[in-house]
Amino acid sequence: MARGKAKEEGSWKKFIWNSEKKEFLGRTGGSWFKILLFYVIFYGCLAGIFIGTIQVMLLTISELKPTYQDRVAPPGLTQIPQIQKTEISFRPNDPKSYEAYVLNIIRFLEKYKDSAQKDDMIFEDCGSMPSEPKERGEFNHERGERKVCRFKLDWLGNCSGLNDESYGYKEGKPCIIIKLNRVLGFKPKPPKNESLETYPLTMKYNPNVLPVQCTGKRDEDKDKVGNIEYFGMGGFYGFPLQYYPYYGKLLQPKYLQPLLAVQFTNLTLDTEIRIECKAYGENIGYSEKDRFQGRFDVKIEVKS
């Protein structure tokens, strides 16, 4: 039995290294060299094919603009302050209850201060009244970075923070800032005047403004919203078109989206009110799957 065990032990040792045939794990040095060379060439070819296909694909893709945008959804509409549960609840006499909302607005509007828009090599004045979309050439590097339109904070009126650092929250008249999300090359198409059946009479129509309207989401909310004031360029309730199209972070790294400020001046107290804000346009779509596509809703409660 000891002899059988020794024979078995010698057998696997001989398989690992056979000194008579100069074999390691059953192969000679030449055999190992050939098989390793085969796998190096094989995987090298696979890597070459992979890298080649990636390079060909990259040649068809522009770093400045997506090649295919036919499935890009219309831009979303969002509000500042940005909050996780889309709920704004506060007491006007308790600064701590609305401090987070105010700080969120302050941080967002930092880049809209006059001091941040001084560089004439980057920024330009595009007028104080809405006008047509401002084309800035093709999406390429030939002209370098493109200028962006300045946006003045004082256009936001009571919600600019210039005269009221609490943005209305201290008085129980909260402000929200509305923006249209960025989409490369997107040019909003405002609706025709006659197509806006629900357009409030107080809102001035302008063919160069993408209008926005905020109302009570549900029937029971409509009577509780009270008066709504809008502050935007030229006194219009929407986004002026000269800020479009957007050319992307590489060509317009300092781009400023046009803003619309909305202030709710007499909300019913101690009541959770659901408010929907909606942009209107021929190329603005809405989706039940995405509640921020072209619109958003927010719950606001002013506690006594």
Curated annotation (Swiss-Prot):
The stretches that face the Cytoplasmic side, renumbered to this chain, are: 1-34
Which InterPro entries does the entry link to?
A: Na/K_ATPase_sub_beta, Na/K_ATPase_sub_beta_sf
Q: Which Gene3D superfamilies does the UniProt entry name for this protein?
A: 1.20.5.170, Na, k-atpase alpha subunit
Any GO BP: protein stabilization
Its placement in the membrane is given as: Single-pass type II membrane protein
Q: Where in the cell is it found?
A: Cell membrane; Apical cell membrane; Cell membrane, Sarcolemma
Location, primary (coarse class): membrane
Question: Which keywords appear in this protein's UniProt record, sorted alphabetically?
Answer: Cell adhesion, Cell membrane, Disulfide bond, Glutathionylation, Glycoprotein, Immunity, Innate immunity, Ion transport, Membrane, Phosphoprotein, Potassium, Potassium transport, Signal-anchor, Sodium, Sodium transport, Sodium/potassium transport, Transmembrane, Transmembrane helix, Transport
Write out the GO MF terms: ATPase activator activity; ATPase binding; P-type sodium:potassium-exchanging transporter activity; protein heterodimerization activity; protein kinase binding; protein-macromolecule adaptor activity; transporter activator activity
Ranges in the Extracellular compartment? 63-304
Kindly list every residue the record annotates as glycosylated: N158, N193, N266
Residue numbers of Phosphotyrosine PTMs: Y101
**One annotated Gene Ontology cellular component of this protein:** sodium:potassium-exchanging ATPase complex
Tissue distribution is:
Expressed in the brain, liver, testes and anterior prostate (at protein level).
Q: Which cysteines are joined by disulfide bonds?
A: C126-C149, C159-C175, C214-C277
Q: Name one Pfam family in it.
A: Na_K-ATPase
- Function summary: This is the non-catalytic component of the active enzyme, which catalyzes the hydrolysis of ATP coupled with the exchange of Na(+) and K(+) ions across the plasma membrane. The beta subunit regulates, through assembly of alpha/beta heterodimers, the number of sodium pumps transported to the plasma membrane. Plays a role in innate immunity by enhancing virus-triggered induction of interferons (IFNs) and interferon stimulated genes (ISGs). Mechanistically, enhances the ubiquitination of TRAF3 and TRAF6 as well as the phosphorylation of TAK1 and TBK1.
Subunit-structure text: The sodium/potassium-transporting ATPase is composed of a catalytic alpha subunit, an auxiliary non-catalytic beta subunit and an additional regulatory subunit. Interacts with catalytic subunit ATP12A. Interacts with regulatory subunit FXYD1. Interacts with regulatory subunit FXYD3. Interacts with NKAIN1, NKAIN2 and NKAIN4. Interacts with MLC1. Part of a complex containing MLC1, TRPV4, AQP4 and HEPACAM. Interacts with KIRREL3. Interacts with OBSCN (via protein kinase domain 1). Interacts with TRAF3 and TRAF6.
Its recorded name reads Sodium/potassium-transporting ATPase subunit beta-1
Which species expresses this protein natively? Rattus norvegicus (Rat)
Gene for this chain: Atp1b1
